Amino acid sequence: KNFLCSADLKEFIETYHLNLSMDGSLNPRDVFGSHDDADHVYNTPRAWFMERYLNPNTYRWDGALADFTPVSDDLPWCMVPEKKITVEDVKYVLSGHYQGTPYDPYGSYGDKSMRGAYRSIGINRNDFMALIQIRPDMEADCRPVEWIAYGSNAFNALVPFYADVEETPEYLNNTTGRVSTENFYWSSRLIAAMADASYNKSLFHVERYQERVAAKGHELINRYDARLSLIHISEPTR
């Protein structure tokens, strides 16, 4: 009753005897998921990292006494985060490479044996990232904001667009077939290529770049939200 699903999902599970529980309870992961060895490299660790970040105090995630580890098949199927989620939270999760854990492929201290053991969410083969921010307190024509980034998520920066716009600045909309710093797409790819090869030296600069782009994005959205609010007041039927 708490989740969206197909109207006939219960009938489908019963017809094909898919519920594997002994007590009649339903675990969707057991019914429709998998526990392959590959999951313990590509999927389960990523879910562990996300839940660890969004619910750091709900469970013990690290150490010998951890409630859940990167290879736990019984990770919570869904959770309510400990606080409201921001655009920056989503960006961090989708850029994750197990920062602060022994599994960070960019790690430079501690035990090296487990670095890169699990596939990161933010890897150097990322090419595009987008998230939709729905703002219920805004008018319909400016309620959704789409945040977009190009290149590797570990090094890229999100820029915001009103979802209803039909044109965007040349620097942002033109990818070109030629590698160049004259557009946002290739600039993002170039930053990632250089920073990936010199992570520890580049991290400080990359983080400052990401923070400044995000701050400018929020500043622009706030500025034009205010202008649009004046339009809505003067033209209430708009």
Language model feature labels by segment:
Residues 1-80:
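Extended, regular secondary-structure scaffolds
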Residues 107-225:
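Substrate-recognition/cap regions that form aromatic- and gly/pro-loop-enriched pockets
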Residues 44-54, 58-103, 107-117, 121-126, ...:
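Long, compositionally biased low-complexity segments
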Residues 17, 85-86, 151, 234:
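Helix N-terminus capping/helix-initiation residues
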Residues 8-11, 27, 37, 44, ...:
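Exposed alpha-helical structural elements
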Residues 231-237:
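Residue-level detector of conserved catalytic or cofactor/ligand-binding positions
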